[in-house]
């Protein structure tokens, strides 16, 4: 009933545009990175059929990387673009666009954690496991050890908080806003992305600066801005998903608001968070700080602006015309995993 009620109203949804104070940026390597990303995804058997290939082509994950990391060196930018295509496809097939929980859910998610903890794949890898191992090994080589561990911890939390998201969707009604926010900031996968912001700007922020309360608050605000905006932008697609569909907008509706009111409330929260981010960023960067911290804050700004521009100008991931074909991946998720993982790369246990 919860989903059916929203489906009947969703055609009237008007997605707001968010105004960002700093200019658009994009790496000049965008096109070549996108092309190589597609070849890499092919090599690792991530594009499971022609329909999936078409979906990835029109989604433009390489351009998301190019917008969010405009100053990254070519090797790191390529690794990030490959990570993006892997992450979005794995997230869809493991959690979002399949049944709330399946016989393979635990095996799939623990395999991703194992790659981080053991630096090897299993003897019988699940979908995307060898691709994930390849990304992690490349990032280990490209990043400082602590920087890689920040990325890895963010991904461990993505895999583990997915269980909380699943539990929430097994309840008759969603948890409240505060509980949802705690889950959302980790299932989004954004913390691993922001952990790369300094390296992508040719810096390596030190721990004593990275873990300052105000710096961590900027990281949280970046996460909130992107996630809450995405809750509006992806609502039309997500409400049609068989698995995960509850988000900030639907929870406000559950609390008694109309769809229009819930979107307005969420929009206001995004704009308020954006305003607070700008004020705090000015405070953090006003005194004499290291160049590494300064470029890290710049990297957070690139992520906010880059994501928003990607949604408006580049991607069709949330396009209404593809909802019917893209929202439900249950038929894809039941394909024989052994067929999806025949790849010539990497070691296994």
Curated annotation (Swiss-Prot):
<feature type="binding site">
    <location>
        <position position="230"/>
    </location>
    <ligand>
        <name>Mg(2+) 3</name>
    </ligand>
</feature>
<dbReference type="GO" id="GO:0010333">
    <property type="term" value="F:terpene synthase activity"/>
</dbReference>
<feature type="site" description="Plays a critical role in the stabilization of intermediate cation">
    <location>
        <position position="88"/>
    </location>
</feature>
<dbReference type="Pfam" id="PF19086">
    <property type="entry name" value="Terpene_syn_C_2"/>
</dbReference>
<keyword id="KW-0479">Metal-binding</keyword>
<keyword id="KW-0456">Lyase</keyword>
<feature type="short sequence motif" description="DDXXXD motif">
    <location>
        <begin position="91"/>
        <end position="96"/>
    </location>
</feature>
<feature type="binding site">
    <location>
        <position position="184"/>
    </location>
    <ligand>
        <name>substrate</name>
    </ligand>
</feature>
<comment type="similarity">
    <text>Belongs to the terpene synthase family.</text>
</comment>
<dbReference type="InterPro" id="IPR008949">
    <property type="entry name" value="Isoprenoid_synthase_dom_sf"/>
</dbReference>
<feature type="binding site">
    <location>
        <position position="234"/>
    </location>
    <ligand>
        <name>Mg(2+) 3</name>
    </ligand>
</feature>
<keyword id="KW-0460">Magnesium</keyword>
<feature type="binding site">
    <location>
        <position position="96"/>
    </location>
    <ligand>
        <name>Mg(2+) 2</name>
    </ligand>
</feature>
<protein>
    <recommendedName>
        <fullName>Sesquiterpene synthase MAC_05714</fullName>
        <ecNumber>4.2.3.163</ecNumber>
        <ecNumber>4.2.3.171</ecNumber>
    </recommendedName>
</protein>
<feature type="binding site">
    <location>
        <position position="238"/>
    </location>
    <ligand>
        <name>Mg(2+) 3</name>
    </ligand>
</feature>
<feature type="binding site">
    <location>
        <position position="91"/>
    </location>
    <ligand>
        <name>Mg(2+) 1</name>
    </ligand>
</feature>
<dbReference type="GO" id="GO:0046872">
    <property type="term" value="F:metal ion binding"/>
</dbReference>
<comment type="function">
    <text>Terpene synthase that catalyzes the conversion of (2E,6E)-farnesyl diphosphate (FPP) into sesquiterpenes which are important for fungi-environment interactions. Produces a mixture consisting of 8 sesquiterpenes including corvol ethers A and B, as well as traces of epizonarene, gamma-cadinene, delta-cadinene, alpha-cadinene, alpha-cadinol, and an unidentified sesquiterpene. Produces both corvol ether A and corvol ether B in similar concentrations.</text>
</comment>
<feature type="binding site">
    <location>
        <position position="96"/>
    </location>
    <ligand>
        <name>Mg(2+) 1</name>
    </ligand>
</feature>
<dbReference type="InterPro" id="IPR034686">
    <property type="entry name" value="Terpene_cyclase-like_2"/>
</dbReference>
<dbReference type="GO" id="GO:0008299">
    <property type="term" value="P:isoprenoid biosynthetic process"/>
</dbReference>
<feature type="site" description="Plays a critical role for substrate recognition">
    <location>
        <position position="92"/>
    </location>
</feature>
């Amino acid at each position: 009933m919860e989903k059916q009620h929203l489906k009947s109203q969703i055609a009237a949804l008007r997605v707001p545009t968010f105004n960002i104070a700093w200019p658009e940026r994009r790496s000049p390597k965008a096109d070549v990175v996108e092309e190589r990303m597609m070849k890499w995804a092919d090599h690792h058997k991530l594009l499971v059929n022609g329909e999936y290939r078409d979906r990835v082509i029109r989604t433009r994950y390489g351009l998301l990387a190019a917008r969010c990391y405009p100053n990254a060196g070519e090797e790191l930018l390529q690794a990030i673009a490959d990570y993006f295509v892997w992450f979005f496809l794995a997230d869809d097939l493991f959690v979002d666009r399949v049944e709330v929980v399946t016989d393979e859910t635990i095996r799939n998610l623990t395999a991703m954690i194992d790659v981080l903890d053991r630096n090897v794949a299993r003897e019988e890898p699940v979908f995307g496991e060898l691709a994930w191992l390849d990304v992690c090994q490349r990032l280990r080589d490209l990043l400082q050890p602590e920087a890689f561990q920040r990325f890895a911890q963010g991904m461990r939390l993505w895999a583990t908080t997915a269980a909380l998201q699943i539990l929430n969707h097994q309840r008759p009604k969603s948890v409240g806003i505060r509980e949802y926010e705690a889950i959302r900031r980790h299932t989004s996968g954004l913390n691993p992305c922001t952990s790369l912001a300094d390296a992508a700007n040719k810096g390596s922020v030190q721990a004593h600066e990275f873990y300052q309360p105000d710096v961590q608050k900027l990281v949280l605000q970046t996460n909130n801005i992107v996630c809450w905006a995405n809750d509006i932008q992806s609502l039309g697609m997500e409400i049609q998903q068989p698995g995960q569909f509850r988000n900030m907008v639907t929870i406000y509706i559950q609390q008694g608001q109309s769809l229009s009111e819930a979107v307005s409330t969420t929009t206001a929260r995004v704009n308020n968070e954006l305003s607070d981010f700008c004020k705090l960023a000015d405070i953090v960067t006003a005194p004499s700080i290291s160049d590494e911290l300064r470029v890290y804050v710049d990297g957070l700004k690139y992520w906010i602006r880059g994501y928003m521009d990607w949604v408006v100008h580049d991607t069709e991931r949330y396009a209404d015309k593809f909802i019917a074909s893209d929202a439900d991946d249950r038929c894809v998720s039941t394909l024989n995993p052994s067929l999806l993982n025949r790849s010539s790369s990497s070691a296994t246990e």
